Amino acid sequence: MYKSKFLIAIMVIALVTMACGINFNLPVTEVKTGPKQTDEISVPIPDTKSTIDLTLSFGAGEIQVQPEAQDVLISGTVSYNVSDFKPIIEASGSQVEIKQGNLEINGIPNFDKTVKNTWDLNLNTGVPLNLNIKAGAYSGKYELGGLSLENLDVTDGAADVDVNFSEPNLSNMVKLSYNTGASNVTLEGLGNANFENMVFKSGAGSYRLSFDGDLKQDGTVSVESGISTVTIVVPEGVPAQVTFEGGLSHVQTYGAWAQSGDSYSMDGTGPKLTIDVKMGAGTLELRNK
């Protein structure tokens, strides 16, 4: 029940922002729903030697993405009961985008739980990708393990999101970037992401960044967060250095962390994580599991 109410609320925020801008004098507009429609998605692999830039532009609703060994770049389904949500596919050279259709409204949309918009997409595991996810207020579940990601860039609004790398990323990832608003975000298996640099920026909310997995190379991580609780998990035995800056925040450590002023470290062997954390207020938790 709570999740349903949360999704309705964030859909309003996202679509007002995307379609109308902020205007408190706008009238309330009923969102017209109809029978549920399901579109089959099948996007061929572009004929190019370049890394494919794949963009998923999603306004509000629910999205699920997972890897799949297949002959096409993307397969899956999109289900919706608002005709304006019909997805649009654009492809040119190495650029591919799937985007939610624009909702045509003249005021503030009045949503209830009958409004549906669900994406379920499978991504090709063997094609090198720069994956860009641009979303509004939504619920998302991304299983990205086993893909060939060279860059990952996620930007979303008020969101409830789980990202997981349950298997190693098959490519070297130059940069992993996640920028979110007031959200609840969990990133698991980051050791499998095979990244060189990671940037995580957030507003108020609750965030968990777990670097479990098979860390293949040194990684540099920058975390900037507002009034929030940020949990960073580094498995015991992985060398790590965390530098913290946050005048109105405090740090709680659990496990094998050693403190020296605003610096926290853990001994280990193999590739090292260097993490810089800046917080406006709240709590930083450092854990081993």
Regions found by a protein language model. Name each.
Residues 1-6:
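Positively charged n-region of N-terminal signal peptides that target proteins for export
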Residues 16-19:
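C-terminal motif of bacterial Sec signal peptides marking the signal peptidase cleavage site
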Residues 39-45, 76-80, 84, 95-112, ...:
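Short, surface-exposed interaction patches in beta-rich subdomains
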Residues 156-158, 180:
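Periodic small-residue-enriched repeat registers in elongated scaffold domains
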